[in-house]
Amino acid sequence: MNKTRVSIYTLAALATLGVVGCGEEPKPQPPAAPPPPPSIEIKIGHVAPLTGGIAHLGKDNENGARLAIDEANAANIQIEGKQAKFVLVAEDDQGDPKVGTTVAQKLVDAKVAGVVGHLNSGTSIPASTIYSGANIPMISGSATNPLLTEQGLKGVFRTVGRDDQQGPAIANYLVANNKPKLVAIVDDATAYGEGLANEVEKTLKAAGVKVLPREKGTDKTSDWKAVLTKLKGRRPDAVFYGGMDATGGPMLKQARELAIKAVFTFGDGACTDKMKELAGDAADGLLCSQAGIPPQAADKKFLEAYKKKFNVDPILYSPFTYDGTRLLIEAMKKANSPDPAKYLPELQKIEYTGASGKISFDDKGDRKDAEMTIFTMKEGKLAPIAIIKGGLTISFDDFVKASEPAPAPAAAPAAAPAAEPAKAAEAPKAEAPKADAAKK
């Protein structure tokens, strides 16, 4: 009896355990997300004057580089199997060659992987020797003096044209359209201003135009009355100034106050809308050149992104510093390394289409097939009027039309569905033609 009860209780307990054991199994948990890849910080330097008379141009250049950095970080680029985090190290060289070399060494010590800059030729040329000596590539988006790439230094590039392209462009345009017989030339005694003025003078003399003895200022001159009074007595048909807008604007304003009626022409450093701010109504009708396509012709995506991020339009060379930054990053991607020794060969042979068009470099580091643009000031705004490339001049409007992608061909209309064949039973019987009809 007791054994029977024990057996019953044992079976009941086992049954209970069985019910529990056969209950619903726990749901499988989703696999844990893989850990994010390790990151790698890659520093890219940018240098331009962020204080002083041309700080607006320096900030414009920096904005272009910063936009490229932000876009690259948003793209989740992986290099060496690691998540790349690009950091822009922005420095102010004040447009001063001595400060420029100090800043260059600072970037070398910070172990930047590459440099975009400097803005001025006068700072870019001495700084380039420091970067090249440290095997750090530099790409200037605005330094136009030929000496930058004629030094034969390794790893030095530019995304704009050279002054020995820009000088002839503005001089030949002036000769062809204004036909001056006597031209005065003034420069600001910088590597950029003097170098560009030299190219203009050579071209004018080769065209048979008489050129007055050179007049000089500095990159800080604000009172030009002594120089202009001397020029007024010589009655030139045109005046070319090699310098920046911060000094070119006051020169032009003072010239008109002295009733000098000559056509005033400028290079890219003074080819900005700020000339209107500095010279007032005297700016209308000026001629100037830029060593590349104008900002208005830059890639639309770049223009929209720039305006959205900075709430202003590009001023001058920000499309070119944007491209310079992207070129460094693209070369690193191709080499799968931020090590300059590994990515420099990729940079030298790169072919890239960016905000300023198609870019590739020659053996010196110059941009191949660089365009030059001629502007005039109209109603307070710079207006591009001509593009010069390979010695050929075309109107800006024609250049824009030629650059627009051809419209996609219209899709062929869909074929009408085939008529359903009539069923044999429903097909009408054709009448035999009458004899008279057959004779007709």
Regions found by a protein language model. Name each.
Residues 2-5, 9-14, 22-440:
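Extracytosolic ligand-binding ectodomains
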